[in-house]
């Protein structure tokens, strides 16, 4: 998982959804650099089925370097924003740096991309992987609709545009950004065969880093 914002929350939500079906290890906190990532991989046990890891960067080439440490089957990009602008100088360079996570994926692997962020959506053209998208956009594979967010949490409908299946999600995380993070988690869960309803239940009780 990488992105300018939302990496840690998305990682936590993904791990919660996958844990309904698999033995999961995840990055603790936001240990997402060349030191923290190997620490996470060292926590993998013989019975671990999926590792959910967060990848951060401070410049071009760093995500690629982390990908050499952790060969991934699914890559998630949450968004491209102005974080690290002082290091990379332009949104295009930030997108290039984040996009390194999908560039080497094969046709057997999956890129999960935010359909609402133009820089992330454009990464679909830079990968050989199968592309699954999420967001509010009508073209998103997993689309959020009927979103209500209050001081107590968020309620929304997730629609799988391929099957038309819908599920209601009621979770204790506030803000539309967390709805997007949840949609990413549901999308990743679906890639691994987790039912939408099971992901919705997991999100109801998921714990986010720092909360």
Predicted features along the sequence, with ranges:
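Heptad-repeat coiled-coil segments of the DHp/HisKA dimerization-phosphoacceptor module
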Residues: 116-117, 160
């Amino acid at each position: 998982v990488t992105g300018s914002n939302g990496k840690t929350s998305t990682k936590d939500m993904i791990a919660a959804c996958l844990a309904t079906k698999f033995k999961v290890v995840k990055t603790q906190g936001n240990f997402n650099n060349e030191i923290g990532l190997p620490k996470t991989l060292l926590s993998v046990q013989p019975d671990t089925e999926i590792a959910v890891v967060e990848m951060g960067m401070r410049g071009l080439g760093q995500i690629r370097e982390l990908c050499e440490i952790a060969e991934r089957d699914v890559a998630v990009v949450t968004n491209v924003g102005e974080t690290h602008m002082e290091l990379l100088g332009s949104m295009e360079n930030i997108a290039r740096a984040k996009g390194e996570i999908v560039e080497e994926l094969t046709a057997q692997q999956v890129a999960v991309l935010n359909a609402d962020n133009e820089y992330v959506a454009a990464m679909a053209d830079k990968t050989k992987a199968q592309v699954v998208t999420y967001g509010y956009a009508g073209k998103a594979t997993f689309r959020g609709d009927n979103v209500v967010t209050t001081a107590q949490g968020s309620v929304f409908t997730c629609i799988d545009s391929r099957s038309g299946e819908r599920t209601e999600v009621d979770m204790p995380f506030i803000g539309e950004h967390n709805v997007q993070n949840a949609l990413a988690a549901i999308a990743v869960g679906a890639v691994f065969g987790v039912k939408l309803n099971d992901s919705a239940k997991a999100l109801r009780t998921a714990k986010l880093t720092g909360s």
